């Protein structure tokens, strides 16, 4: 058992009274939660419970689509990212996201990393080479691709492609890393590599992962939040959530009685 407690952690994200609407239908209901800095927080729950919606609020990706609205407060470093004046470019530089299916750009491995950086910073050639290497090392991919950086990224295996997407995201040096079912399309060996990588990434980043795989949440995360029908039912350290949950709904889900 660990001795983790949200009360003793430094807060990275504070969620207050968050509600979310699709076409005027409420899908998140008065969410209050704290995301601690440089820890891994897993969000679990049955399909349609709102966990991916919550994740997408953290970088406001929903703003790309019509008739979607978030209300309440999401404080990143004490600033409300939902405020009208909060810059989207600033938010995207602070909060990176990796999706369920790896989507490498149809270009070289090197350009997959440098392309994203060029849109945010002006670096010399040497600085860019160093940044690309750092990102690939950070995603545990460098040793596998260092001799074929000019080859197409689409030729990588599924697991390598997902690590490339992680490298592309961390190359921008965000503060928060969002992972939406990052291993659901991968084989067990690739999944194991990604899980090991996730545990290493928390040394530099605050990590939030949405997963249907409860074993993955138990293995990787420091804290776990259980959601059901748009509500946050329980949130605490992972050991407690999985062994001594305080809510019956949480216990029923974890023990397989529904979901």
Curated annotation (Swiss-Prot):
Gene Ontology cellular component annotations, sorted alphabetically: plasma membrane
All copies of domain ABC transporter, residue ranges: 13-254
EC number: 7.3.2.1
Sites where the protein binds ATP: 45-52
GO biological process: phosphate ion transmembrane transport
Parts of the chain that traverse the membrane: none
Subcellular location as annotated: Cell inner membrane
Catalytic activity: phosphate(out) + ATP + H2O = ADP + 2 phosphate(in) + H(+)
CDD domains (UniProt xref): ABC_PstB_phosphate_transporter (cd03260)
Molecular function via GO: ATP binding; ATP hydrolysis activity; ATPase-coupled phosphate ion transmembrane transporter activity
Topology in membrane: Peripheral membrane protein
InterPro entries attached to this UniProt entry: AAA+_ATPase, ABC_transporter-like_ATP-bd, ABC_transporter-like_CS, P-loop_NTPase, PstB-like
Key words, A-Z: ATP-binding, Cell inner membrane, Cell membrane, Membrane, Nucleotide-binding, Phosphate transport, Translocase, Transport
Family, per entry: Belongs to the ABC transporter superfamily. Phosphate importer (TC 3.A.1.7) family.
Assembly with partners or alone: The complex is composed of two ATP-binding proteins (PstB), two transmembrane proteins (PstC and PstA) and a solute-binding protein (PstS).
Function of the molecule: Part of the ABC transporter complex PstSACB involved in phosphate import. Responsible for energy coupling to the transport system.
UniProt protein name: Phosphate import ATP-binding protein PstB 1
Organism encoding this protein: Pseudomonas syringae pv. tomato (strain ATCC BAA-871 / DC3000)
Organism lineage: Bacteria, Pseudomonadati, Pseudomonadota, Gammaproteobacteria, Pseudomonadales
Gene that encodes it: pstB1
